Amino acid sequence: KYDKVTAQRQPGSTFKLFVYSEAMNQGLAPCDKRRDEFISMQVPDKKTGIIRTWIPRNANGNYSGDSITLKAGFARSVNTIAVRLGQEMGIKNIIRTAQEMGIKSPLENEPSLALGSSDVNLLELVNAYCTVANDGEHCDPVVVTKIVDQRGNEVYVAPHTNKQVLPYQTAFFMQQLLKGGLTEPGGTSRSLNQYIFKDTDWGGKTGTSNNHSDAWFMAVSPKLVVGAWVG
């Protein structure tokens, strides 16, 4: 049977969480700026090894040419900035950070990974976003927390595997970036802000794969992370 929770799909821009997390790990801050401009790269084809030109494009097909903050770049899901950060921070470092945050699927060491080109599943993606909500502390997902008998005796307690994998500052910065998706001008999930109670603390990230085959939304609050996939 096809299990949509564990099925492998391209995460699209939801993967930018790991690109920006590694950027924060390496000392950048949401107020730092990068330019949204044309990029052309020579990349070997995975199957043939032939060198091809890869030109990452934004969703609207345009490059503003503006130098914008990372907070705005994340909120607007600007592809060129994510690709540039991927090259600056190192794809191998981004892979390591993604794995530490909860991604178990194999990830390709290629520039397009910054845009979510490698398949992951919904369960591990939600788990990784939980790491940000949990102030940088990762915990493996657990279905059964404990089992008690009819007398109330605990016959099984799930082991705790909590581990601090992100510095608190990185997690805090990423929480602010996720909020920006709902609040920043041009934020890809800003339209949802009208449906959220003003006293609640929510953030979110959208994602779309090539040809719009997959659409994702990750909603994050301090106590709850929800992932949705349509495709």
Positions of the model-derived regions?
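Secondary-structure transition/capping motifs at alpha-helix termini
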Residues: 24-32, 104-106, 134-139
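A penicillin-recognizing enzyme superfamily signal
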Residues: 1-4, 15, 72, 76, ...
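Conserved catalytic neighborhood of penicillin-recognizing serine enzymes
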Residues: 28-94, 138, 149-179
